[in-house]
Amino acid sequence: NMTERHSDTCGQRHEHAHGKSKIEEALGKYDSAPSDDSVREAVKKIIAEKVQEKDTPEVKKCLMGSIELTTLKTTDSPESVMAFTERVNEFDNTYPDLPHIATVCVYPCFADVVSETLEVDGVEIACVSGSFPSSQAVIEVKVAETALAIKDGATEIDIVMSVGKFLSGDYESVADEIGELKEVCGDRKMKVILETGCLKTAENIKKASILAMYAGADYIKTSTGKLEPAATPEAAYVMCQAIKEYYDKTGIQIGFKPAGGINSV
C-alpha cells in the first residue's frame, strides 16, 4: 500500500541508528550498481537477443497504448493545447485499429483546458510540476503548484528529483521533498524524473532510483526531455533492474517511464 509505505518512511526518516539516516540504511540494503562497462555489455546482449523477437505488431500496439502525448513548449497557449487535445478525441476515427494513448501531458496552467476538452475515457491527464524542468524552487512553491494542478483536473503528476541536492549527497532532503509531494498527490500517480543524463553513472542512477521509490514514487522516469543526453538504453536497464530488486524486497510494483529523445521503435 503506497500510503502506508509513504507514512512509514516519512515518520522514520529522521531517526538515526549507528550514525546512519533511514535513507542511508535503506540504500545500503540494495545491491551495488553494476559498472558502467558491464551495463553497456548487458544492453548490447539484450538488443542482440531480444529486439528481433519483440518486433511484433502486438508489442508495437502495447507501446502505442503506453505513450504519454506531451506538449511542454514555451509557445503553448490555451488554443494550441485545446487543438492538441482534440487530436486525442479524434484518434479512434483516425486510427481505428490502434489502442488509445495512455496520457496527455501539459504544464499545470493548462490542466483545466485538457480537462474541459478531453472526451475519451481512460486517458489520464498528467501535469509536470514542482518547478519543471529544473526542480529549483522552494518546497512551498512545488506543493502549491502540484495542488493547483490536481484541483484543475490533473490525474497524474510528474515531478523532477532535486538533482543538485542528490549530487551533493543530501539524500534526506531529496527524499523529504518527494514524500511531501506524494502526500499532496494522495492516490493520484506520481512520477519522479531522475534526469539520468545529469547523473552520468550507473551507480548514481541506481541510487536515485531506489531513493525515489523508497520516498513515494509510483513511477520512476528517465528524463525531462529538456536536456541531453535524455533517455538511453543503459539508463533504462539500470532503472528497470532497480525496480525489480525493489519489488523483490517489498512486493511493491513501481512503474517505469522512458522519456526524451525516443523517436523510433
Model-derived features: where do they sit?
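Charged, compositionally biased N-terminal leader segments and the immediate start
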Residues: T3-I67
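Short, intrinsically disordered, charge-balanced linker/junction segments flanking boundaries
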Residues: R13, P258-V265
